[in-house]
Amino acid sequence: MANLKERYQNEVAAQLQEQFSYANVMQIPRITKVTLNMGIGDATSDKKLIDNAMGDLEKLSGQRPVITKARKSIAGFKVREGWPIGIKVTLRSERMWDFLDRLVNIAIPRVRDFRGLNPKSFDGRGNYSMGVREQIIFPELEYDKIDRIRGLDVTITTTANTDEEGRALLSALNFPFKK
């Protein structure tokens, strides 16, 4: 079991219930899923890029990514409807907690010139989105075996009703937000 999950169950849930004075334990915000998305715009010209990106994301997440396809044609981007333009993975339960544990304790501290996560990246419903500029901050990916630096989007979906509740949940789980 991941350290973050144990910490949530043993400390954070009680702390949040006290802070927001919830009457029912089911009202306490919790993380439901983490979605990792990697947009690969160059995949229209080189099909190998998708395979390499899928390998990277599979090493990060522990499960096989799904290819996302263009919904409509856009001439300016030289994209046709149905062409592969990205990949994504949705993590739940144990894999989600393992990924969050590695993200907070290993990957984020390895970011160059890191000054904290942007506290304004909540969506109004307690969900948090962040971008990772370089996938090499994760120790699972070996620097020598990467064909190119790619970024990815990490979206953390919670049951929180407001941004304040979501921020309190993630802060209690040691997410380093800017002050």
From Swiss-Prot:
Keywords: Ribonucleoprotein, Ribosomal protein, RNA-binding, rRNA-binding, tRNA-binding. PROSITE patterns: RIBOSOMAL_L5. Signal peptide: none annotated. Transmembrane segments: none annotated. It holds the Pfam family Ribosomal_L5_C. Coiled coil: none annotated. NCBIfam families: PRK00010.1. Belongs to the universal ribosomal protein uL5 family. HAMAP family: Ribosomal_uL5_B (MF_01333_B). Part of the 50S ribosomal subunit; part of the 5S rRNA/L5/L18/L25 subcomplex. Contacts the 5S rRNA and the P site tRNA. Forms a bridge to the 30S subunit in the 70S ribosome. This is Large ribosomal subunit protein uL5. It comes from Chromohalobacter salexigens (strain ATCC BAA-138 / DSM 3043 / CIP 106854 / NCIMB 13768 / 1H11).
